[in-house]
Amino acid sequence: MVLTPDGEEFMDYARDILNRINKLEHSYRDGSHKKRKFGISVPRACYISAAFAEFSKNIGDGDVEIYYKETNSKKTIQKVLDNEYKLGIIRYSEAYDKHYKTMLEEKGLNCELVAEFSYVLIMSRDNPLASKETITYDDLSSYIEIAHADPYVPTLSMSKVFREELPDKIGQRIFVFERASQFDLLSENPKTFMWVSSASDKILDRYNLVQRVCEGNKKTYKDVLIYHKGYRLSKLDKDFITALCEARRKFLK
């Protein structure tokens, strides 16, 4: 059988299609066509979100899906256990370090210290406390505290955790679950304040806020990275951790 010119052109076209199909099948078999994925569940913290923003600038051109969840430690632990997220960062008072480490070991999770710090106060530049040379706990009693409504410590009742994390001296509190609303409240209401890990100058300037130390505040907190034992960190995981360490050095001095 002799192919006509049109037939030869058709066969060349068909061979080209078959070659493309074979290459596509090969890429799926060897994993080179897999969409990259990254997910992390974290506390509501400026330095962590800043790290995430920097990380997002360097994800490259390939297909990728990224998930970033802000929530409390209890939910983060559960999400990592359920493999909903491969990485998590939990925050807790140093006083409960043993509680957490015991629980994480029992659940088969690795834990690595990310940061250790004391909370500072943030408030509007128009807050009367902002101009005080020294701020004490008693000074805060006539102001409105912005707080997160979901503190958690393993083996302790929620009521006990609330008593320890949210002292009775403060008569007025507004509870929030995400950071955007807390900054709007702090910016617009000069009677409000909040305990936070250090915020960046960029955030403070954006919302017309100041950051102050409270005299007598000695409590130390830890942020800890968690993931399943045996889990191999991906390149995206490592890139995020690098950005996280850089943000920690910059923010938590």
Regions found by a protein language model. Name each.
Residues 2-30:
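Alpha-helical "hinge/linker" immediately C-terminal to small N-terminal DNA-binding modules
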Residues 19, 26-27, 31-78, 233-235:
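N-terminal winged-helix
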Residues 48-54, 97, 137, 141-166:
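Secondary-structure junction motif
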Residues 122-130, 222-233:
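A bilobed periplasmic-binding-protein/Venus flytrap-type ligand-binding module shared by bacterial periplasmic
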Residues 81-86, 150-210:
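Hydrophobic hinge/microswitch elements
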Residues 32, 103-119, 123-145:
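Flexible hinge/capping segments at coil-to-helix
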Residues 106-112, 117, 180-230:
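Beta-alpha-beta core module
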Residues 53-54, 74-119, 123:
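Short beta-strand-centered segments that line the small-molecule binding cleft or hinge
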